[in-house]
Amino acid sequence: MDIRQDDHIVIIGNALADRMQHHGWLESYLQQELRGFDLVIRNHGFSGDRVDHRPRSVGFPSDDEYLALSRADVIFAMFGYNESFFDNSEGFAEGLTQWIDSTQAKTYTGEGPPRIVLFSPIAFENLGSPDFPDGSQHNTRLASYTAAMQAVATEKKVEFVDLFHSTKAAFDSSDTAYTINGVHLNSDGNRLVAGFIAESVLGWTPDSSGKNLASIREAVQDKNWHWFNRYRATDGNDVWGGRSLLSFTNGQTNYDVLHHELEQLDYLTANRDRVIWAAARGRTTQADDSNVPPAVEVETNLGEEQLQGGESKTGSILYATPEESMAAMTLAEGLEVNLFASEEMFPELVNPVQVGVDTRGRLWAATWATYPKWEPMKEMDDRLLILPDENRDGVADTVITFAKVHNPTGFEFWNGGVIVASVPNLLFLKDTDGDDVADVRIEIMGGLGSADTHHSANGFAYGPDGYIYYQRGTFNLSNVETPWTNNQESDLSGLYRFNPRTHEFSFHTENQPNAHGTSFDYWGYHYATDATGGRAYQIIPNDEGGFNKRRLLDHTVRPVPGSDVISSSHLPPALEGNFVILNVIAFLGAKNYELQYDTRTGFVNGVEREDLLVSSDLNFRPADLDIGDDGALYVADWANAIIGHMQHNVRDPSRDHEHGRIYRITASGRPLSEPANVYGRPIPELLELLEDPINGVRKRA
């Protein structure tokens, strides 16, 4: 193929293209084999894209704008998988032809139209698993779409690479699994396909064990991280969407600040191209970022009065100590509180957004130090933390960083590891060598909405059906690919569910506008809350095979970041089965509702009881809660003077990036629960634990 010195190659398409950037094999091979060409390669892939339909969140730059930004000389186009589910290869060929004609009529460099290379979809891999399709029907359709694409390429005189037949042969002749679900490539699969592509582009087989390949790939992945955060900039509604022009102190807008960050990322990305070129030549160098313009200075508006119901929405930059904050708490009768962990004990504990208990009984926390997203030129310090209490005294003894994860808005344990949101991706992380640090990292799903991080995928809860449920709020547009059906596009706020075993994904029910918090009770009844309005709902089946929501209780507070059902043999019996909602403005604490069941209709109603917890510390922001294996209630405190997302500039310097606490609430004079010790127990004993009356024990079993 015609690859020239200094070419800018842009990869576009669906998840096949999108996922390539995270493993970096294709660019690594091309840079290795064409060292001295100083290629600039940018990935514009997007899960769910079709050649004639590429939805984006409001304000996201157009495809042409981004191709111009990347100065595309060559376009690698990867379409066909999502279209194949419509079984209309003729219609696909028409759309592909129109796109080629339109693209060849443009220039993104000022020096003529781009050279186009069409890549067929890969084959569907039969993993021999009952969890996934065998791919026979998929491959019949994909073969048809491959033939249609080849015919279009011949007619329009553009390059064509047949990945379908080459991957089909490789899949059929190897015992190696190249995909995670039949269609989405793992690292081995991306390396395989990168080899096929590189050989087609170069005319020779790339050296898969080149002495510089590892250093090239390391540099490529670093560059791709910076480019990904530019092209797929999270919190895009503040970058280019409806809230980008919100004006704060001195008329400064989010647009002013965040578009400057995009410029910074352009420099950071280009600087790393030079590191790649040096690595290809066998030289080791570090990126020189001295040319990156400094960040825009932002002045806080924290001093401006903001009230809700006569109470201040904002706190103070003078933070109470954890002990002072506990002294400001009023608890329900018979309860007491102690500090489990804080930033004073563990500086890594900053902005805890969700907590959970693993099968060893250890508390985990997702901490979001970079909220609302990572800032260029600073450390990406969001984490999944483990906080073991080895001596069982109710205080964490140490902290372990399991993994660094950007924007970890929700997580749930599964299959010996943890599934965590890092929008737009859903990750599976696992430790396989026993050091409590993740050494497996798999993007198991892409296309989650990321336009507004503060209500992107959150509040993960493992359902009794084996699905992981989460909520997602407004402004976000998701476009998810699965092995089962065409891309699932949705801009609806509400509940979604994902089966980590089969990779089935579906929208569950609407919950406008800012959905946070989902939980299940002993009987499997399902509940959800909305942060903005503070409303709580029971999720019930309807007559059409779907689900609706009905009012669970009379809400009196807002906003609500989380909710849960109490299930503990330690806490007072009067609290057992009660529904608890957390609130972070005006009323700072936890509301408590007794759930009353109508066994005739199946409807559940919440009746307000004594507040579980209320604080007069204006920086107390309870974000999540969970019951530990000792039966105590653990409450994560965001601990921030600022709680509003849109009320302050995204980079307001009063947004705190240093504080975070976890408090432990116990019942005075009542024995703690005996830990179930789920980890490592044989299956017969785990089956017995499924009869345990405590929800958390059954879930962990």
Predicted regions and their residues:
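Conserved catalytic region of serine esterases and O-acyltransferases that act on ester linkages
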Residues: 4, 21, 177-317
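Substrate-gating cap/lid alpha-helix
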Residues: 126-163
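Acidic/histidine-rich helix-loop elements
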Residues: 43-58, 182
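Oxyanion-hole/transition-state-stabilizing segment in secreted/luminal serine hydrolases
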Residues: 12, 22-24, 56-94, 124, ...
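Beta-propeller domains with acidic blade repeats across secreted/periplasmic ectodomains
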Residues: 109-111, 295-689, 696-699
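Structural recognition of the beta-strand scaffold that forms the well-ordered cores
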Residues: 8-12, 40-45, 73-79, 115-120, ...
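A short helix->loop->beta-strand "cap" motif at the edges of active sites that frequently abuts
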Residues: 104-115
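Serine-esterase "nucleophile elbow" of acetyl-processing enzymes
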Residues: 1-46, 63-71, 75, 193
